[in-house]
């Protein structure tokens, strides 16, 4: 014998079937961030160190700023050479132009390593 439905589960009269619900909670829009990647790199370099949300926000702004600068410079270089595609060569040159001395060398070597790893994994 099937169980009897309680008063709570019964449908209420007066509401049209299939009508859109207005009392649903709105989903918050996702905010993209480099936070998890910054955290992973920090743990590789300093495993016993933490980071505050304010410091993470500053680091995220820094990464966004550098990304925009490199992208703009690489775009400019492609335009100067009458190319419609930004390749790793333009990005590498942009990094050399934007970052000072030793920092540029390290960035280029890490970038080359990342591109090589990506192409071999395909």
From Swiss-Prot:
Keyword Transmembrane: no
Top-level division of the source organism's lineage: Eukaryota
InterPro entries reported for this sequence: Histone-fold (IPR009072), Histone_H2A/H2B/H3 (IPR007125), Histone_H2B (IPR000558), HISTONE_H2B_site (IPR055333)
UniProt PTM comment: Monoubiquitination of Lys-117 gives a specific tag for epigenetic transcriptional activation and is also prerequisite for histone H3 'Lys-4' and 'Lys-79' methylation. GlcNAcylation at Ser-109 promotes monoubiquitination of Lys-117. It fluctuates in response to extracellular glucose, and associates with transcribed genes.
Annotated Gene3D superfamilies: Histone, subunit A (1.10.20.10)
Gene Ontology terms for molecular function: DNA binding; protein heterodimerization activity; protein-containing complex binding; structural constituent of chromatin
Transmembrane segments: none
NADP recorded as keyword: no
Site of covalent link Glycyl lysine isopeptide (Lys-Gly) (interchain with G-Cter in ubiquitin): 117
Modified residues (N,N-dimethylproline): 2
One GO CC term on file: nucleosome
A Pfam entry, by short name: Histone
Compartments, as annotated in UniProt: Nucleus; Chromosome
Glycosylation sites: 109
Keywords linked to the UniProt accession: Chromosome, DNA-binding, Glycoprotein, Isopeptide bond, Methylation, Nucleosome core, Nucleus, Ubl conjugation
Region annotation Disordered: where it falls in the sequence: 1-31
Predominant cellular place of this UniProt entry's protein: nucleus
Quaternary data: The nucleosome is a histone octamer containing two molecules each of H2A, H2B, H3 and H4 assembled in one H3-H4 heterotetramer and two H2A-H2B heterodimers. The octamer wraps approximately 147 bp of DNA.
Similarity comment text for this entry: Belongs to the histone H2B family.
Free-text function comment from the UniProt entry: Core component of nucleosome. Nucleosomes wrap and compact DNA into chromatin, limiting DNA accessibility to the cellular machineries which require DNA as a template. Histones thereby play a central role in transcription regulation, DNA repair, DNA replication and chromosomal stability. DNA accessibility is regulated via a complex set of post-translational modifications of histones, also called histone code, and nucleosome remodeling.
Protein known as: Histone H2B, gonadal
Natural source organism: Asterias rubens
């Amino acid at each position: 014998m099937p169980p009897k439905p309680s008063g709570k589960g019964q449908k209420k009269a007066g509401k049209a079937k299939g009508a859109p619900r207005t009392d649903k909670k709105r989903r918050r829009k996702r905010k993209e961030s480099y936070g998890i990647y910054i955290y992973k790199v920090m743990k590789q370099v300093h495993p016993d160190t933490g980071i505050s949300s304010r410091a993470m926000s500053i680091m995220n702004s820094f990464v966004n700023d550098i990304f925009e600068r490199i992208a703009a410079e690489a775009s400019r270089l492609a335009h100067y050479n009458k190319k419609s595609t930004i390749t790793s060569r333009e990005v590498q040159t942009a990094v050399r132009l934007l970052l000072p001395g030793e920092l540029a060398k390290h960035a280029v070597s890490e970038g080359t390593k990342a591109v090589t790893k990506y192409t071999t994994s395909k």
